[in-house]
Amino acid sequence: MVPSRYLYLVRHGEADDDDALTGAGRLQASAAGERLRYTRFSAIRHSPMQRAEETADLIADFLPGVPVGASGLLGDYLPPVSGPPDLPPPYAGLLGSYTPEERSEGAELASAAIQRYARPGGQDDSELIVTHNFLIGWFVRHALDAPDWRWMGLNQCNGGITVILYRTGMPASLVSYNDIGHLPPALRWTGFPAEIVPPPR
């Protein structure tokens, strides 16, 4: 039997301008914790950013005994982009807002994050990561063998849950993507580009 390693990726809750969770963000984090409370995790890892740490701590309240720790590999940075020269203007504008040094550092961190976390394990395992929109898109892009720039446009809602399965000798499987079914309607779609939010029924 091939061991199954599940990587759960949660985007932090909604945050204010000071990087602290808003009231809605705290509710989103708690709802994610409630949703995940029956999953047996080996560890919870999170970005060093305050909004991710607060989210991880609130989720951990539902997962007693699971070790929690920060990793600089899971921070809020720009993953690599070496795509076509004719990127859509919004994407090109995003790249222009980062210095060459920031882009180089982000590429190194993103590569290291994949090597550390996006891999099969020697036994059945589930690990939870609380991180940011860009990096979750980067993990999904990697799982699907898409071009490295294609994390752009893969957006996550605050409190959304994405799950990727890794097994030795097999391609990664995207089990679920941006699951927000655990969030009440008023807490869904925050942090998501307004122009692509599905219209209400």
Each language-model region and where it sits:
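Active-site metal-binding loops of divalent metal-dependent hydrolases
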Residues: G13, N133, I180
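Phosphate-handling substructures
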Residues: D17-D19, I59-Y117, R201
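Active-site-proximal alpha-helix that buttresses catalytic centers in soluble enzyme cores
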Residues: V2-S71, S97-R103
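Generic beta-sheet signal
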Residues: L7, Q123-F134
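Acidic, low-complexity terminal tails and accessory targeting/binding regions
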Residues: M1-S4, G65, G69, D76-P88, ...
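Active-site signature of alpha/beta-hydrolase-fold catalytic machinery across serine-
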Residues: L58, W138-H142
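Glycine-rich phosphate-binding loop signature in dinucleotide/nucleotide-binding domains
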Residues: Y38-R40, Y117-D125
